[in-house]
Amino acid sequence: MSPQTETKAGVGFKAGVKEYKLTYYTPEYETKDTDILAAFRVTPQPGVPPEERGAAVAAESSTGTWTTVWTDGLTSLDRYKGRCYHIEPVPGEEEQFIAYVAYPLDLFEEGSVTNMFTSIVGNVFGFKALRALRLEDLRIPVAYVKTFQGPPHGIQVERDKLNKYGRPLLGCTIKPKLGLSAKNYGRAVYECLRGGLDFTKDDENVNSQPFMRWRDRFLFCAEAIYKSQAETGEIKGHYLNATAGTCEEMIKRAVFARELGVPIVMHDYLTGGFTANTTLSHYCRDNGLLLHIHRAMHAVIDRQKNHGMHFRVLAKALRMSGGDHIHSGTVVGKLEGERDITLGFVDLLRDDYIEKDRSRGIYFTQDWVSLPGVLPVASRGIHVWHMPALTEIFGDDSVLQFGGGTLGHPWGNAPGAVANRVALEACVKARNEGRDLAVEGGEIIREACKWSP
């Protein structure tokens, strides 16, 4: 037991406020394979030493509080406390530094992303001694990874279910997102799927509104799926959004989707919450449904560069909680992202083992062992002229999701879908023949236009 937690007969309990760094700053600490490691970007209030602020983050996100309490003597803080074990400056930012914190695995409930985030980020972000705080990355130890089911099926099983290999999958979000009747909505789904897309999608805020109740939408979309499958000979799907006000209602919608025989449902995992998401993920694995994940509300959390959480942390959490697809940004299009950083967390979604690479924003080596991978979804503001870049950047294991880039075609929905499919097939064929998509992409698309709407 450490001197800070030890109580001795005859001495009595010594109350009072102590500097955090006396207990929680331990630069000599050697991290364990079972520790959860966190990298925080810290912007402290003026005049506060980095060691004290880094230790404060470790304390307030683990066992600490603002004062010494007598019940410290009833446990072992050395076993349970978080430790700030390293501090480094942020290049180009005089007032910021990266604090590395190690958390003992016993602080976390098995298989619960909810508990993990409640512990690590649930309270410390309101700490007034900090001007701003951002969680840049987490290292999830193998011992903790193995307590999660992860994605319901994963990349390979999805390809086997769809019988589609050797190319990215194509999707489309039905527009306008709100206001269509269920029958007209189903018609748009049918036209897009018949034209050559693999999937169509409910927008994130399509749940069960007065203009289109969920059950009606599910029925008309299922009819569209079966009709397009019969005409094309391909397996098709529509992301039926099961997100609801309660977990019970969400599962009821997923059950109805399964009874209709459709292949995939959808969830808004941040607004719906990690407990709901994990519940739905378990249901999907048990019942053969794929699970598409939308990240609605992510920018509230990850957009600020010095406060909140980076999306790579949310992506890791989703892989643990469970989802077969997740929107990941495009690098091109109207929501352009930093290419290397985006591909860094795309690899964290898909690959089994990812080495530390600070140039791509990856602070820790991550081993996912047997946890299935997640397909990244590139969407928003993309169209056929982006197809060469998207095919080159994201590779085969991805979903390319066109909304206005399909439905905005001057000839209608089905020709828009045909144009997307022809462009994709042309890019994949050219790539397989050894042509450089980055250099010849425009020419490849122009050649494809001769055979497409």
UniProtKB/Swiss-Prot annotation:
- Residues with the modification N-acetylproline, per the entry, are 3
Q: Which NCBIfam families match?
A: PRK04208.1
Q: Which GO terms describe its biological process?
A: photorespiration; reductive pentose-phosphate cycle
Modifications the protein undergoes after translation, according to the UniProt entry: The disulfide bond which can form in the large chain dimeric partners within the hexadecamer appears to be associated with oxidative stress and protein turnover.
Question: Taxonomic classification, please?
Answer: Eukaryota, Viridiplantae, Streptophyta, Embryophyta, Tracheophyta
Q: Name one GO molecular function term.
A: magnesium ion binding
Q: What class of enzyme is it?
A: lyase
Whether GTP-binding counts among this entry's keywords is: no
Gene encoding the protein: rbcL
Q: What else is known?
A: The basic functional RuBisCO is composed of a large chain homodimer in a 'head-to-tail' conformation. In form I RuBisCO this homodimer is arranged in a barrel-like tetramer with the small subunits forming a tetrameric 'cap' on each end of the 'barrel'.
* Residues holding substrate: 123, 173, 177, 295, 327, 379
What this protein is reported to do is described as: RuBisCO catalyzes two reactions: the carboxylation of D-ribulose 1,5-bisphosphate, the primary event in carbon dioxide fixation, as well as the oxidative fragmentation of the pentose substrate in the photorespiration process. Both reactions occur simultaneously and in competition at the same active site.
Cofactor or coenzyme needed:
Mg(2+)
The N6-carboxylysine modification is found at 201
Q: How does it assemble?
A: Heterohexadecamer of 8 large chains and 8 small chains; disulfide-linked. The disulfide link is formed within the large subunit homodimers.
Q: Name one GO cellular component term.
A: chloroplast
Q: Where is this site: Transition state stabilizer?
A: 334
Name of the protein: Ribulose bisphosphate carboxylase large chain
Propeptide stretches in the record:
1-2
